A protein has these predicted regions:
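Short, small-residue-biased leader/transition segments that mark boundaries at the very start
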Residues: 1-13
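Conserved DEDDh/DEDDy metal-dependent 3′-5′ exonuclease domain
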Residues: 25-93, 101-102, 106-127
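Conserved helix-turn-beta segment of the N-terminal RecA-like "Helicase ATP-binding" lobe
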Residues: 65, 69, 327-353, 358, ...
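Acidic, Mg2+-coordinating catalytic module of metal-dependent nucleases/exonucleases
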Residues: 95-182, 196
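Conserved pre-motif I regulatory segment
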Residues: 241-292
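Conserved SF1/SF2 helicase motif Ia
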Residues: 288, 292, 297, 302-344, ...
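Conserved helix/coil segment N-terminal to the catalytic DExD/H
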Residues: 308, 333, 351-394, 402-408
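Short, conserved "post-DEAD/DEAH" coupling segment immediately C-terminal to helicase motif II
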Residues: 385-390, 405-432
């Protein structure tokens, strides 16, 4: 090896003093203990220093010491930032869960450093296995970004100097909208675009059969780069006015109806295509709508089809607020038994603890694109945390008369729905209206 990598985490006390240092070098030499001087003597002269979540944590406490020990010019590599780019496909990398490095021992910096080195080497190998075109795209988007530049220097990778807009359009033809404003996205959100493209690379449009349907953006990415959700919407869920090969195929509501439900056309009432009008307003125009249908009139399809298409195209979650647990079960059973659609879940009081945990996991991991809950569930902190970790396509209020009709049976938690959505959007720092 012609480079030096020191992978190190630190353990801190509650008063923010560093208690324990750990590092491993490329030649397998290690250091572990509470001696600051021994630690910096060990890492002296490093060209590159690697850690997991090092920018957000370790550097806060050691950056000044780096400068004092001649390490100001060392390249800093954060394995956390590259994990979603290079292992975007579920089950992701076995050493990473959300933003945490999976380790055999708690509070052992040396063990963490060894795992971090292992992860780095696998990330380098994963990058080398990418198609040359996507390697160039990642380089052109990220090589000038502080959190990413050292990785490419370590690889001595320079990429090509192609027109990035044209390069992405070519590599992702038929995978994103041809008329999305790529030049502006590249200018304003290069990191977010990189995370979106990495995930799109593993999308499989045969959504019903593919195990890749549940590959999603890790919650820490959405939290630190909230515009990822907005950009994914622009690339994959916003139908262009001119029409393009992607939008015509994957945002066409008639082909979606056939693909998901097996129907050739929408149902009409008094010769009016009410179902089609409602679905088009959601999918084509991204509008919030009120749809009033007679009992048994096919109302459910007007929100289920857009939800399934949003799950297919952007792996987004649609939250359906329903007044009755039995109604939730009936709709999920109908999707499964009549249409073989298994990406809907419910979390309600009828579930035993094991069933409830499995439902949470399905939503958290991305294998559910429709979630049925009661209005009371919005008071739950666990539900709030769950939804914060997913890209939310929209909220649906099923049986909307429960929301508007006052009386002795009125459930006051319906009044909280609007406030909850507002708070959720503020917490997600998402500039795209839910």
């Amino acid at each position: 090896l012609h480079w030096m990598v020191h992978s190190f985490p630190t353990r801190r006390s509650s008063d923010l003093n560093v208690l324990d240092y750990g590092a491993v070098r490329h030649d397998e030499a290690v250091v572990h203990g509470g001696s600051r001087s021994q630690f910096f003597e060990f890492i002296a002269g490093a060209e590159f220093i690697c850690g997991h979540n090092i920018f957000a944590h370790d550097l806060k406490y050691l950056e000044k010491d780096f400068a004092n020990h001649g390490l100001a010019e060392a390249g800093i590599i954060d394995t956390l930032h590259f994990s979603p780019l290079l292992f975007p496909r579920k089950p992701y990398h076995h050493l990473v869960k959300n933003d945490k490095l999976q380790s055999d021992e708690l509070n052992n910096p040396l063990n963490d450093a060894i795992k971090c080195k292992e992860l780095l080497l696998e990330e380098l190998e994963a990058f080398n296995q990418l198609k040359a075109g996507f390697q160039d795209i990642l380089f052109l988007l990220l090589h000038n970004q502080h959190e990413f530049s050292a990785f490419f220097k370590l690889l001595n990778f320079s990429g090509c100097e192609n027109d990035l807009h044209k390069h992405i359009s070519t590599e992702f033809a038929d995978k994103i909208c041809k008329n999305a404003d790529l030049p502006e996205i590249i200018r304003a959100n290069p990191v977010e675009l990189a995370y979106c493209l990495a995930l799109i690379n593993v999308f499989d449009h045969d959504f019903k059969e593919s195990p890749d349907q549940s590959s999603i953006t890790p919650p820490w990415v959405s939290r630190n780069y909230p515009d990822v959700e907005k950009i994914m919407f622009q690339l994959r869920s916003q139908q262009c006015a001119d029409g393009c090969s992607y939008c015509n195929q994957y945002l066409d509501i008639h082909s979606g109806l056939k693909r998901w439900f097996g129907y050739d056309e929408f149902r009409c009432y008094d010769d009016k295509p009410l179902q089609e009008i409602a679905v088009a307003a959601v999918v084509k125009e991204n509008r919030s709508i009120l749809a009033v249908f007679p009992t048994g009139g096919g109302k459910s399809i007007t929100f289920q089809l857009p939800a399934l298409m949003a799950g297919e195209n952007a792996h987004a979650l649609t939250v359906v607020i329903s007044p009755l647990q039995s109604l939730m079960k009936d709709q999920i059973d109908n999707l499964e038994h009549s249409h073989h659609i298994t990406c809907a879940a419910t979390i309600n009081g009828l579930l035993d603890p094991i069933e409830r945990q499995k439902a949470y996991e399905r939503v958290e991991e991305g294998s559910a694109s429709i979630l049925y809950i009661s209005p009371e569930s919005l008071r739950s902190r666990s539900i709030e945390r769950l939804l914060l970790g997913r890209n939310i396509a929209r909220f649906v209020i099923d049986e909307a008369h429960c929301f508007s009709a006052w009386g002795q049976d009125f459930r006051v938690d319906y009044l909280f729905i609007g406030e909850f959505i507002k708070q959720l959007q503020q917490q997600k720092q998402n500039r795209r209206q839910i």
